[in-house]
Amino acid sequence: MSFTFAIIGRPNVGKSTLFNRLVGQKLALVDDTPGVTRDRREGEGRLGDLEFTIIDTAGLDEGAKGSLTARMQQQTETAIELADALMFVFDARAGLTPNDRAFADFARRANKPVVLVANKSEGKAGEIGAMESYALGLGDPVQISAEHGEGLSELYDALRALMPEPDVELEDDEEIDGLTEEDFSKRPIRVAIVGRPNAGKSTFINRLLGEDRLLTSPEAGTTRDSIAVEVNWKGRDFRIFDTAGLRRRSRIEEKLEKLSVADALRAVRFAEVVVLMMDSQNRFEEQDLRIADLIEREGRALVIAVNKWDLVERQGGQIAQLRTDADHWLPQIKGVPIVATSGMLGEGVDRMMEAIQDAYAVWNTRVPTAALNRWFEQAVAQNPPPAVAGRRLKLNYVTQTKARPPSFVVFCSRADAVPQSYLRYLVNSLRGVFELPGTPVRIMLREKANPFAHKRKRKS
């Protein structure tokens, strides 16, 4: 009989989206309205070489006896009884709610193995919410985006640990990451090209395609929708989204333009690498910096293209100056790749595609555990954390929780007392030692559990 997982959690946290992702087809209706799933649905799930039965359940919620909500809950309880293990899903962007905490207790009482799944983990809000979930006592959260297919290699590891050994072993040249995340070497890299209006985004993509596929005009705002085009460059597939220009909010007046901007922001969230295209005549303006900050908050790899370079009077050292300017204006993502381009003349196309591919590789970085531990010991020894109110802060150890972007948790004695300046020191040191330019690096703090805390409570 197939190993069975039940997906449980409160309404509208993405259970059906995860179910559809694992089953490989849209068997479950997905909508933003809580309670869309009313029955339990079963399907044959697959993740890499893992095969299992998966049950999608209604959102756990209290309801009057005999009501539709109560019957939905009964279906969920039946699914839990049938399952060998549970996937407890919560919305990391929303953070933990009282219902999440109540039904985490419910999951524990089921006396089944539980995989804690932090869905919608994109961006800083999602990562903070994921770290919150340690309080549930269900182990390490697996950070994913069911909608975008991110974090599946981490989910694979968590499911693999609970399942019996497969009858057939993987061949030596098959890698888990390739299997579980749709084979990175074959799946197109998703790239969004964003920037202020009339920066030359569509002209550049037309040059890349070798045809006038996208409408261009000197008038700002020609592109209204996010348009996706498929590009094969030197044997590697890319899916590139041309987006509407992003103006300051106060200058967005027409309803259609508001929708276009919302579409561009969605493209950023869906992308893996984002190219911020600037006009060489007006670079690093306030709106450029706002867009770059958005890209960093969403956890996407960043490449800066300074377009219309043909209009710049050529002098030595200009590219080096651009890099200096970028590090000055964007200290949160030091070392971001910068490419000078001319969409009109076709200059810089190859350099841009190489930069995108390199940024994607950095974004997917996993640091070997031994090297990470060596770095941590040296970084703390060279610059110990400051004492707070006369008490020394102790940093115990570090672990990488995920890639895409590289994210780490530092276990320490007092998480709330570690200054932001020291956290920035760790991020910059980590970025420099492991060569992680131009991609967000997340370091979260978590207090190490005190094994004597319960004894003190018992005495008091």
UniProtKB/Swiss-Prot annotation:
GO function term, MF aspect, one: GTP binding
Q: Where does GTP 2 bind?
A: 195-202, 242-246, 307-310
| GO biological process annotation, one example | ribosome biogenesis
Q: Where is the KH-like domain?
A: 365-449
Superkingdom, according to UniProt? Bacteria
* Domain EngA-type G as annotated: residue spans: 3-167, 189-364
> Keyword annotations for this protein?
GTP-binding, Nucleotide-binding, Repeat, Ribosome biogenesis
What InterPro entries does the record point to?
A: G_ENGA (IPR031166), GTP-bd (IPR006073), GTPase_Der (IPR016484), KH_dom-like (IPR032859), KH_dom-like_a/b (IPR015946), P-loop_NTPase (IPR027417), Small_GTP-bd (IPR005225)
Instruction: Look up keyword Electron transport and say if it applies.
Output: no
Q: Which residues bind GTP 1?
A: 9-16, 56-60, 119-122
* Pfam families linked to this entry: KH_dom-like, MMR_HSR1
Q: Membrane-crossing residues? A: none
Q: Of which family is this protein a member?
A: Belongs to the TRAFAC class TrmE-Era-EngA-EngB-Septin-like GTPase superfamily. EngA (Der) GTPase family.
Under NCBIfam families, the record lists:
GTPase_EngA, small_GTP
Q: What does this protein do?
A: GTPase that plays an essential role in the late steps of ribosome biogenesis.
How does this protein assemble? Associates with the 50S ribosomal subunit.
> Which HAMAP family does its entry note?
GTPase_Der (MF_00195)
What is the protein name given in its UniProt record? GTPase Der
The uppermost taxa in this organism's lineage are: Bacteria, Pseudomonadati, Pseudomonadota, Alphaproteobacteria, Hyphomicrobiales
**Gene name of this polypeptide:** der
